[in-house]
Amino acid sequence: MKLIGRLLLYVLIACLVVIFGFYFLLQTRWGADHVSNWVSENSGYHLTFDVMDHRFSAPSHLLLENVTFGRDGQPATLVAKTVDIGLSIRQLTAPLHVDTILLQDGTLNISVQTAPFPFEADRLQLRNMALNSPGSEWRLSAQRVNGGVMPWRPEAGRVLGNKAQIQLSAGSLTLNDVPATNVLIEGSIDHNQVMLNTVGADMARGALTGVARRNADGSWVVENLRLNDIRLQSDKSLSEFFAPLTTVPSLQIGRLEVTDSSLQGPDWAVTDLDLSLRNLTLRKEDWQSQEGKLSMNASEFIYGSLHLLDPILNAEFSPQGVALRQFTTRWEGGMVRTSGAWLRESKALILDDTAIAGLEYTLPENWKQLWMKPLPDWLNSLTLKKFSASRNLVIDIDPAFPWQITALDGYGANLELVQHHQWGVWSGNATLNAAAATFNRVDVRRPSLSLTANASTVNISDLSAFTGKGILEATASVSQLPQRQTQISLNGRGVPMDVLQQWG
């Protein structure tokens, strides 16, 4: 019996020596190479690491240094200086499910094509990592990333898994070509739904904070978004700048606040923008709203040749359309003020009270072509219920027939200036007068005009002007039918006979 006991003891000692020898060999470069080769040859993955380290002071942790891991024939999914694997008793029943995995000082590539990791963890921790998502819907590049994912159960094309809590911070991040720094994200993933409970970042010399949710169908719900002191320059036109909003099924905005921000593009700019938007849903090129509100003001707004100073806009949204409570701006040296409503069903813009004062406006060279060009689908008609003008200067520099009207005043009622997407004077009445005018180099004084329009005819009951020592007076009627039949009655007293030659 003593001999058998001694043999068992020797066998046990030999086994322990082999185990400890194997244990220490695994922590050498030779052991690391053999483990890496074994994994690469017996699986669809490639794995390399320099050293495997285990310390009795932390017996449940396994440390791998200078790790590269990925799918065979594809770029590496993970490159890390250190991978700390926390083991637990679960390895007895689920060897590939560990307690924690800490990735430190490396890069993690996330894309739809990324193969699933063959292991999972109760918690994935990132420390000073870089994240990239080449070829994915969200073009993401982040550096100095810290945080965690709980639990971490990666699947094909979903490195973060189907259901997890997320808390991440990044020193710098670029998402779809938009850079940001000091980024903080807290939220969760539930299959195809992403909940962002906290989003914060410094971007464009300002700050962004918000709460948002991405639904399974790809639509977004922004509960709260604040932009402060943004200074953003873009190389995109205004339509291209907002184009991403039309690529999602819908964007529901609960509350959007923009404070003291400036944005600039190739042919557009807005400075010192303050904006507050409530309860608006954008769906492709349309919108819906229940009790929505918009308040906006800025120091300057530029879009092409349009240049507005100190614009103020207050509006309310409803299923029926837009109630324009206030719009005022300084434009071309003067002031424009109006209020009214846009009706969704008829696509009609009805302005209750419009006032234009002190303008010094030169018509664009192609204003006649613009007058004939059909207007967008959303503007079927435009009606000025009440209109007034005061001390305006209007100039046309057309070399064939230049003209200028000085100190133009006027008023009108129920003027329909757009019908079936076409400019015109389709109904209503107006009276215009000025201190002086020049038509094709012929000076006149105190020109005045009174007209009344209906569905069939534009009647000019008074058209007069002083020239030289005489006066010109006329009446006219212009048919609204396509033939545009015109009748004119002209009287002149004390005017030269050749005064009309300059007018053709």
Q: Where are the regions that the model predicts?
A:
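N-terminal glycine/threonine-rich, aromatic-flanked beta-hairpin/loop signature
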Residues: 143-168, 276-297, 411-431
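Short, solvent-exposed loop/hinge segments that bridge or flank secondary-structure elements
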Residues: 132-145, 264-282, 396-417
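Non-cytosolic head/periplasmic domains of membrane-anchored proteins
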Residues: 107-146
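Broad, structure-driven detector of short, well-ordered beta-strand segments within folded domains
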Residues: 85, 110, 140, 144-150, ...
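Small-residue helix/turn framework positions
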Residues: 61, 66-68, 123-130, 160-203, ...
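Terminal hydrophobic membrane-targeting helix
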Residues: 19-115, 153, 173-181, 206-208, ...
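N-terminal Sec-pathway targeting helices
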Residues: 1-15
